[in-house]
């Protein structure tokens, strides 16, 4: 009887493989970084072959590290950096161009063109997304329009498109299976999230042939089996979800109104809205959380661009701390920020402002301002931005949040988590396993093969490490937040000509 599930977590900077047991405990983990390619300013690429090779290397390596055999693995679940786009030749299996990464801005002119035509409203309505270079649709168009011979090959049905999940599954099955799941499809800007199919009108507008696109399947489903030549046995590939949706699942946010916030370079907050796609009036994205058991569940998503990256800025550019954990130590040396606010709008502001021209500011400085105050204000900015998104989410959904589940690197910072609870006025729950993205992929795969029987069983695996209760008086909380809103106003539209 197979005792484990393997998650392949293909991220923006590294490929990871993690083995989990039945209780959701991590048995072994291995990761490998790969190259970031910057051909021009604002352009970001990855080599798809390097992604595949690094991913398969850690997959084989982690089995060895765990001291188990491939036949001990019940299923493989995949989670991936979303939106990143690969186009490859169906016959040779080779990419015709590098993968265009989600951060890449090269297709901004295509997006401006769609907006000028007024086509953005249609896209918002059908896909739940805002028109932005972030999503896959314009990236596919760019490859077809700019790589020699690509358009002709596509018309002849010789090319395949996929996000990283699709590319990995295709390679794991040696070209037998070309699929994606609902959550990844919903990030392409080509998928109608209400009708649950590729949208012909958008495909026509972007001139992308439908024959390139993968088949869309549930997020928990046996898509196929790994080719015997890879692990020596055939292992079912049975789970697939984009990284943020996988984290929502790994946090057991199964009921409408449950939300998680992942603290990484930026922050991604997702709230489960159940079987209803809630349109956003406040600048959030409406997205598919997952498709399981013949039905699809939706989520609202708010993306904050700079959170953990602001701590790196204190370390690398300002050089006022030596390492990230030190930020907590310094923040605790002072009682408050002495009236200082930091707005880390280094690349503009994401949800709910969507201001590309905002820039970073430090306000409220007086002669008494010390480095501890600036460090503390930078940490606090992460919590304020999270409140901005949460308020938008509550307004859109009409649901009042009971508690916020957290994960990701900065969720280990106790000062930040306590301040987060204080400024939101709701408890913040940190789980024992903060690797919730990989865990979510493992759960989706395990459910499809009966390794876990139900979501109830998974919920029992979710264990709290610590609950942070709000301890700040309402009056103080609102006064601090008013100051933040004032600081954000100073940052807005700064870089506009």
Curated annotation (Swiss-Prot):
User: What are the record keywords, sorted?
Assistant: ATP-binding, Glycerol metabolism, Kinase, Nucleotide-binding, Transferase
Positions annotated to bind ATP: 12-14, 265, 308, 312, 409
Which residues does the record give as sn-glycerol 3-phosphate binding sites?
Answer: 12, 82-83, 134, 243
Instruction: Respond yes or no to whether keyword Ribosomal protein is given for this record.
Output: no
Q: Where does ADP bind?
A: 12, 16, 265, 308, 409, 413
Tree of life domain: Bacteria
Gene3D superfamilies the record matches: 3.30.420.40
This enzyme catalyses:
glycerol + ATP = sn-glycerol 3-phosphate + ADP + H(+)
Q: Which GO terms describe its molecular function?
A: ATP binding; glycerol kinase activity
Residues binding glycerol:
82-83, 134, 243-244
Give the EC number: 2.7.1.30
Q: Which GO terms describe its cellular component?
A: cytosol
Query: Which biological process terms from the Gene Ontology are attached to this UniProt entry?
Result: glycerol catabolic process; glycerol metabolic process; glycerol-3-phosphate metabolic process
In which pathway is this protein known to take part? Polyol metabolism; glycerol degradation via glycerol kinase pathway; sn-glycerol 3-phosphate from glycerol: step 1/1
Q: How is its activity regulated?
A: Activated by phosphorylation and inhibited by fructose 1,6-bisphosphate (FBP).
Enzymatic class: transferase
Q: What InterPro entries does this protein map onto?
A: ATPase_NBD, Carb_kinase_FGGY, Carb_kinase_FGGY_CS, FGGY_C, FGGY_N, Glycerol_kin
Q: How does it assemble?
A: Homotetramer and homodimer (in equilibrium).
The record's family statement is: Belongs to the FGGY kinase family.
The protein's matches in PANTHER family, at most eight in alphabetical order, are given as: GLYCEROL KINASE, SUGAR KINASE
Its biological purpose is as follows: Key enzyme in the regulation of glycerol uptake and metabolism. Catalyzes the phosphorylation of glycerol to yield sn-glycerol 3-phosphate.
Protein name, as recorded: Glycerol kinase
Recorded source organism is: Caldanaerobacter subterraneus subsp. tengcongensis (strain DSM 15242 / JCM 11007 / NBRC 100824 / MB4)
């Amino acid at each position: 009887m197979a005792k484990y599930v393997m998650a392949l977590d293909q991220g923006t900077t590294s490929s990871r493989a993690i083995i989990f047991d039945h209780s959701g405990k991590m048995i072994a983990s291995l990761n490998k970084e790969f190259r970031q390619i910057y051909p021009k300013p604002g352009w970001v690429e990855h080599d798809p072959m390097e992604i595949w090779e690094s991913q398969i290397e850690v997959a084989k390596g982690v089995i060895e590290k765990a001291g188990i055999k491939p036949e001990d693995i019940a299923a493989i679940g995949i989670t991936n950096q979303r939106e990143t786009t690969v186009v490859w030749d169906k016959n040779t299996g080779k990419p015709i161009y590098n993968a265009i990464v989600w951060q890449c801005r090269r297709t901004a002119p295509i997006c401006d063109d769609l907006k000028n035509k007024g086509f953005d409203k249609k896209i918002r309505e059908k896909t739940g997304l805002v028109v932005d270079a972030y999503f896959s649709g314009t990236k596919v168009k760019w490859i077809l329009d700019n790589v020699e011979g690509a358009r002709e090959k596509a018309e002849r049905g010789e090319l395949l498109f996929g996000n990283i999940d699709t590319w990995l599954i295709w390679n794991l099955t040696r070209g037998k299976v070309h699929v994606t799941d609902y959550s990844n499809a919903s990030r392409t800007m080509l998928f109608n999230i209400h009708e649950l199919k590729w949208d012909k009108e958008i495909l026509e507008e972007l001139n992308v042939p439908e024959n390139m696109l993968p088949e869309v399947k549930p997020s928990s489903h046996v898509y196929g089996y790994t080719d015997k030549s890879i692990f020596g046995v055939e292992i079912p590939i049975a789970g697939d979800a984009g990284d943020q949706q996988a984290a929502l699942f790994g946090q057991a946010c199964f009921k409408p109104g449950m939300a998680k916030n992942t603290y990484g370079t930026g922050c991604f907050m997702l709230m489960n809205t159940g079987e209803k796609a809630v349109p956003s009036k406040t600048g959030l994205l409406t997205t598919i959380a997952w498709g399981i058991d013949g039905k699809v569940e939706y989520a609202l998503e708010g993306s904050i661009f700079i959170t953990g990256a602001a701590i790196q800025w204190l370390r690398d550019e300002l050089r006022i701390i030596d390492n990230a954990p030190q930020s907590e130590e310094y923040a605790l040396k002072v009682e408050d920020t002495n009236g200082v606010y930091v707005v880390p709008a280094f690349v503009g502001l994401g949800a709910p402002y969507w201001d590309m021209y905002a820039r970073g500011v430090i306000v409220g400085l007086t002669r008494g301002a010390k480095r501890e105050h600036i460090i503390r204000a930078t940490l606090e900015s992460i919590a304020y931005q999270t409140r901005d998104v949460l308020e938008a989410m509550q307004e859109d959904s009409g649901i009042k949040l009971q508690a916020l589940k957290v994960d990701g690197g900065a969720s280990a910072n106790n000062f930040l988590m306590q301040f987060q609870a204080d400024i939101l006025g709701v408890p913040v729950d940190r789980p024992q396993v903060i690797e919730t993205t990989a865990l979510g992929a493992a759960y989706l795969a395990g459910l499809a093969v009966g390794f876990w029987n139900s979501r109830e069983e998974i919920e029992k695996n979710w264990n709290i490490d610590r609950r942070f209760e709000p301890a700040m008086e309402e009056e103080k909380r609102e006064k601090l937040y008013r100051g933040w809103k004032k600081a954000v106003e100073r940052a807005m539209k700064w870089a506009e000509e």
